[in-house]
């Protein structure tokens, strides 16, 4: 059952079109929920790509994608096109950060401050 759900999600995301830099800039300048939603939806493939890099027997791909999506939404809220970065470059940091935080919290039996862990990863 879980694989069917994941496969349907992957198929649905594969149909989403990615935006070019011009479209990203115009959407981010609008600063409204509809524009942010379109920005997020057009970058869901990036989340899947990054999540697959962190997949292991201990980490379920669905969980990694879910956490990565949280990072993507956070990036959409904080993105400022005037800084000159592409959204995907900016978002990759937040996606990886959320995925790493999830893996750390899930797989550690001893609690180490997340800031200390981030220094080494």
Language-model-detected regions and their locations in the chain:
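Alpha-helical promoter-recognition and RNA polymerase-docking modules of transcription initiation factors
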Residues: 2-112, 116-121
